[in-house]
């Protein structure tokens, strides 16, 4: 009987931890000074994100304390709904290219707070990045990998190469090409 209970308990633990997000390693060429000099990018593709057509843009500024602040603007096609998140990004200690993100809805009632970990898994530090996000808190937030690009209309060859290096196909990802980003 003890063996059966132990096996059930182990199975429950394995199932619970199987859903945890393990942050992927950051790109070896990541350079925070160059990377955060790019103030505005578009999410052009999402591996696990919603299928609906949304335009998501990131605007980032450097802070004097070596953290960065990012404003994430999400606009559904047709401009019917806009969601703005204000995030403070702090580098993970001793890990280049990985960050803790604490995001809130500015001017909100204090009810929405989302915490994430992020890892820049591929980048050229100026035109594109693949970023892996793992939720720490936040209902409805799922693990995702997104393509960030300065050019919303074309896929940078570096993106294609990085996706291929991971054994993925961009054709299987959700494109934001027809989302109507301005």
From Swiss-Prot:
GO terms for molecular function: toxin activity. InterPro entries: Calycin (IPR012674), Triabi/Procalin (IPR005657). Residues 1-18 form the signal peptide. It is found in: Secreted. It comes from the Eukaryota. Disulfide bonds join 21-134, 55-181, 87-103. Expressed in salivary glands. Its main location: secreted. Very abundant protein in the salivary gland, accounting for at least 30% of total salivary lipocalins. Belongs to the calycin superfamily. Triabin family. Inhibits platelet aggregation, vasoconstriction, and angiogenesis through binding to distinct eicosanoids involved in inflammation (acts as a scavenger), and has a role in inhibiting host innate immunity by impairing platelet-assisted formation of neutrophil extracellular traps (NETs). Inhibits platelet aggregation by collagen (IC(50)=30 nM), thromboxane A2 mimetic (TXA2 mimetic), or arachidonic acid (AA) without affecting aggregation induced by ADP, convulxin (GP6 agonist), PMA, and ristocetin (vWF-dependent platelet agglutinator). This is Dipetalodipin.
């Amino acid at each position: 009987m003890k063996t059966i209970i132990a096996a059930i308990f182990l199975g429950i633990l394995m199932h619970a931890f199987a859903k945890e997000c393990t942050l992927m390693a950051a790109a070896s060429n990541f350079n925070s000074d160059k990377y955060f000099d790019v103030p505005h990018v578009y999410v052009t593709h999402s591996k696990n994100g919603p299928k609906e057509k949304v335009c998501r843009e990131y605007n980032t500024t450097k802070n004097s304390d070596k953290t960065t602040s990012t404003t994430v603007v999400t606009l559904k096609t047709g401009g019917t709904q806009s969601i703005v998140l204000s995030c403070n990004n702090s580098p993970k200690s001793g890990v280049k290219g990985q960050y803790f993100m604490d995001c809130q809805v500015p001017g909100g009632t204090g009810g929405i707070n989302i915490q994430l970990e992020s890892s820049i898994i591929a980048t050229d530090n100026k035109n594109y990045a693949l970023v892996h996000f793992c939720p720490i808190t936040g209902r409805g937030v799922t693990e995702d990998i997104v393509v960030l690009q300065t050019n919303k209309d074309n896929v940078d060859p570096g993106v294609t190469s990085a996706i291929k290096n991971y054994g993925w196909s961009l054709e299987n990802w959700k494109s934001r090409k027809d989302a109507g980003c301005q």
